[in-house]
Amino acid sequence: MKCFAQIVVLLLVIAFSHGAVITGVRDRDAQCGSGTCCAASAFSRNIRFCVPLGNNGEECHPASHKVPYNGKRLSSLCPCNTGLTCSKSGEKYQCS
């Protein structure tokens, strides 16, 4: 029953959000294409997706900066695109 409830919540979030473009379930960065990383799902760290690297103004994680990362990424955010850095902006970190 718990699994069913989690699936329902996930489907509702996907249906009513403007979330990230998900390009496929993977395990590590090396399995993703250029310009993407294998980020953990915001709902479960056991599920990872290939998502685009951060662009200017997008949220980022300051410790997540290496692509490809050889291990399993724990953050749901990818590093910034080439030429951008992840820096603190107010209370968040953003690519700039």
From Swiss-Prot:
Subcellular location: Secreted
GO biological process, one term: endothelial cell proliferation
UniProt keyword list: Disulfide bond, G-protein coupled receptor impairing toxin, Secreted, Signal, Toxin
GO MF entries: toxin activity
Gene3D superfamilies hit by this protein: Lipase, subunit A
Signal peptide: 1-19
Cysteine pairs bridged by disulfides in the record: 32-50, 37-78, 60-86, 80-95
InterPro entries: Prokineticin, Prokineticin_domain
Family matches, as Pfam families: Prokineticin
Tissues and organs where the protein is expressed, per its UniProt entry: Expressed by the skin glands.
GO cellular component terms listed in the entry, alphabetical order: extracellular region
Annotated family: Belongs to the AVIT (prokineticin) family.
Protein name (record): Prokineticin Bm8-b
Protein source organism: Bombina maxima
